[in-house]
Amino acid sequence: MKTSSPHSLSDLCLLIGEALEENLAPTYWVRAEIASLSLRGHCYMELVEKSANHSIAAKVRATCWQHAYHILAPYFAAETGQTLSVGLQVLLEVEVSFHAVYGMSLNVVGIDPSYTLGDLARQRQETILRLKEEGVWDMQQSLHTPTLPRRIAVI
């Protein structure tokens, strides 16, 4: 087996970076779950996609730079009523970047809160259905209110 002249690792990384830059769109919308999240000025995340049997099908590092995070985080919180956190399913607008030392990562430039709201609504409906099947959904309604309360709490 004959090979062409060998490349240095940094040359190969440069070729990979150039190929990605030339052949990819400027941004992509990506569905993923936040597997880890760290705030240190910038927001560092690890995004995962899980298969049907809950094993990890894909995993990548993502960064939301401080200037973007200060815009996106309050917007997401205002729309969904919660902060970005581990376990949330999110729809992110990302730029793909490749660095010779750090490898491939995603830079977060946008977020669609309606995707997360849809996922939360689906989870809520599944929980309600499960509680109804277990017979505990209407248990509180079966309790009667006494005509004369025995205890009063003052706060």
Cite the ranges covered by each PLM segment.
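Acidic, two-metal ion nucleic-acid-processing modules in DNA metabolism proteins
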Residues: 1-155
